[in-house]
């Protein structure tokens, strides 16, 4: 961790054929109060900047120098060599390992207190897997690299935070994955980070049921009766965490609940993320809770068709960086 008031945020550019490099280069158009270090191939960034017509000076990253506020028209690059020349819009499996190297470098830097937070650009899971590496997402990757047994995936936009009990698993596996043990661990992490990272003294956590109508008293499924409700009651009794639910997912996003909710906990990926993205797509941020470092990310994919065109929406990426900075500053 940097010791002065100016912090060092590492940014990974993600899939080189996608809009990640475009988003990173867009950061150079304005001043930033903290130092932004881009983990990517320097030549790839220069080529994309030329394609986009962005006038930017790239400086080599020196970890021995004290961090300085970022000036418009500049980027500091921690160079990671790409395997093959990246062509905007054209995936290349040869560069799958390159993407992972940038993520590994960023994670190692955070764990060594060299960086204060990671902001990740979008990656293409298919390319990485076809390169011979089993990869299900940033969240799981950073958990493995930091030896964190369990992390929580949260997405946030203005007026709404959602977190997940299960993440990137097939829907058919969700019911068996929603266990008392997992629920308790997920809620512990969610509550802890809401208190410590978001500075919410006594957070209200609203919890979705798994089944339609939260099981309708067992008529539409018994997971609520047998697992979810007893676990929530146990946690409230033993730990005093404020939990409301399980509530039907089709009504939990009503304003009368959201006005009081500091976070909504969903049982699976597509139960809560469609609502979040409908409410704030392009203005949302992905936050990994439970890691020993701060990590935020965009809420969208690689958008290959927009790479190099100058048409990519920078809203989510800028939100992710701004949110990371806010969380870092709260730690000061």
Swiss-Prot record:
Subcellular locations according to the entry: Cytoplasm
InterPro entries per UniProt: PdxA, PdxA_fam
Catalytic activity from the UniProt record: 4-(phosphooxy)-L-threonine + NAD(+) = 3-amino-2-oxopropyl phosphate + CO2 + NADH
Pathway(s) it belongs to: Cofactor biosynthesis; pyridoxine 5'-phosphate biosynthesis; pyridoxine 5'-phosphate from D-erythrose 4-phosphate: step 4/5
MF GO annotations: 4-hydroxythreonine-4-phosphate dehydrogenase activity; cobalt ion binding; magnesium ion binding; NAD binding; zinc ion binding
Note describing how the cofactor binds: Binds 1 divalent metal cation per subunit. Can use ions such as Zn(2+), Mg(2+) or Co(2+).
Primary site of residence: cytoplasm
GO biological process: pyridoxal phosphate biosynthetic process; pyridoxine biosynthetic process
GO CC annotation terms, alphabetical: cytoplasm
UniProt binding sites for substrate: 138-139, 277, 286, 295
Chain residues that bind a divalent metal cation: 168, 213, 269
The keyword Cell wall biogenesis/degradation belongs to this UniProt entry's keyword annotation: no
Quaternary context: Homodimer.
Role according to the record: Catalyzes the NAD(P)-dependent oxidation of 4-(phosphooxy)-L-threonine (HTP) into 2-amino-3-oxo-4-(phosphooxy)butyric acid which spontaneously decarboxylates to form 3-amino-2-oxopropyl phosphate (AHAP).
UniProt family annotation: Belongs to the PdxA family.
Protein name: 4-hydroxythreonine-4-phosphate dehydrogenase
Species whose genome carries this gene: Vibrio parahaemolyticus serotype O3:K6 (strain RIMD 2210633)
Phylogenetic classification of the source organism: Bacteria, Pseudomonadati, Pseudomonadota, Gammaproteobacteria, Vibrionales
């Amino acid at each position: 961790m940097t010791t002065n008031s100016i912090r060092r945020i590492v940014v990974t550019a993600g899939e080189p054929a996608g809009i990640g490099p475009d988003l990173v280069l867009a950061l150079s158009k304005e001043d930033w109060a903290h130092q932004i270090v881009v983990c990517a191939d320097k030549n790839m960034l220069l080529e994309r900047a030329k394609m986009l017509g962005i006038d930017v000076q790239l400086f080599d990253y020196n970890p021995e120098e004290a961090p300085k506020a970022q000036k418009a028209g500049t980027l500091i690059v921690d160079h990671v060599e790409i395997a093959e020349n990246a062509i905007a819009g054209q995936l290349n499996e040869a560069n799958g390992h390159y993407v992972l190297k940038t993520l590994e470098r960023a994670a190692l830097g955070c764990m060594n207190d060299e960086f204060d937070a990671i902001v990740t650009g979008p990656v293409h899971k298919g390319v990485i897997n076809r390169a011979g590496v089993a990869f299900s997402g940033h969240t799981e990757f950073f958990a493995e690299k930091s030896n964190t047994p369990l992390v929580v995936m949260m997405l946030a936009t203005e007026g709404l935070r959602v977190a997940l009990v299960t993440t990137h698993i097939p829907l058919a596996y969700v019911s068996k994955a929603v266990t008392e043990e997992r629920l308790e661990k997920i809620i512990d992490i969610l509550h802890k980070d809401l208190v410590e990272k978001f500075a919410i003294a006594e957070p209200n956590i609203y919890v979705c049921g798994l089944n339609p109508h939260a099981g309708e008293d067992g008529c539409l499924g018994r997971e609520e009766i047998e697992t979810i409700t007893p676990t929530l009651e146990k946690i409230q009794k033993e730990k005093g965490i404020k939990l409301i639910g399980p509530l039907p997912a089709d009504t939990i996003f009503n304003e009368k609940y959201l006005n009081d909710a500091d976070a909504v906990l969903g049982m699976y990926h597509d139960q809560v993320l469609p609502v979040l993205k409908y409410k704030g797509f392009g203005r949302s941020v992905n936050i990994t809770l439970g890691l020993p470092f701060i990590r935020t990310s965009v809420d969208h994919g690689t958008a290959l068709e927009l790479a190099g065109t100058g048409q990519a929406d920078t809203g989510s990426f800028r939100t992710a960086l701004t949110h990371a900075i806010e969380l870092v500053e709260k730690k000061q």
